[in-house]
């Protein structure tokens, strides 16, 4: 799998004051950490799902999020992790999600995957609706792209 390391989240959230939805993953994959942006592993289907939902090709991922009032971030600020494996995550410190929500117009929070959802429920207490979404990672290969797109349509209702 990979070396076990204690890692601090390497990049900032994508957001501005007009953000309406917050999409939270658990922690960036090795590839995302190398490429310094969210969901950058070629096998992760997050950006394919977004393209299908919004019916457009996404070239500038950060600008796409800002244009559509989407904040991207992760629940975890730092952790011990082996490679990209959520199941190996230990020694978690969470990001200051309440502060981010105070500085934007977040009306709904979406958690992409079981680990993100579990950690959010354990550590974060906000009076904002939070919704579980299935992981777009290749580790969730049992879900086909069309099933993921169907699950993620709820995001459009909150924009």
What are these regions (language model features)?
Residues 50, 119-120:
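Hydrophobic packing residues within well-ordered alpha-helices of enzyme cores
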Residues 97, 101, 105-109:
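Proline-aspartate-enriched helix->loop->beta-strand connector
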Residues 24, 111-112:
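Short beta-strand segments
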Residues 31-88:
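Short, surface-exposed acidic-centric catalytic microdomains
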Residues 115-117:
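Alpha-helix capping/helix-boundary segments
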Residues 20-26:
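Short, hydrophobic/glycine-enriched beta-strand segments
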Residues 1-20, 41-42, 83-98, 121-159:
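C-terminal capping/extension of enzyme domains
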């Amino acid at each position: 799998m990979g070396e076990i390391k204690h890692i601090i989240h390497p990049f900032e959230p994508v957001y501005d004051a007009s953000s309406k939805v917050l999409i939270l993953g658990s922690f960036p994959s090795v590839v995302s950490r190398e490429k310094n942006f969210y969901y950058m592993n070629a096998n992760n289907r997050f950006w394919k799902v977004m393209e299908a939902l919004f019916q457009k090709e996404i070239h500038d991922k950060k600008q796409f999020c800002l244009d559509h009032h989407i904040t991207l971030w992760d629940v975890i600020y730092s952790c011990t992790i082996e490679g990209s494996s959520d199941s190996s995550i230990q020694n978690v410190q969470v990001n200051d999600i309440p502060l981010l929500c105070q500085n934007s117009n977040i009306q709904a929070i979406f958690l992409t995957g079981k680990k993100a959802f579990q950690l959010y429920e354990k550590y974060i207490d906000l009076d904002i609706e939070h919704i579980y979404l299935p992981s777009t990672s290749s580790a969730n290969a049992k879900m086909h792209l069309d099933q993921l797109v169907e699950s993620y349509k709820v995001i459009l209702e909150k924009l």
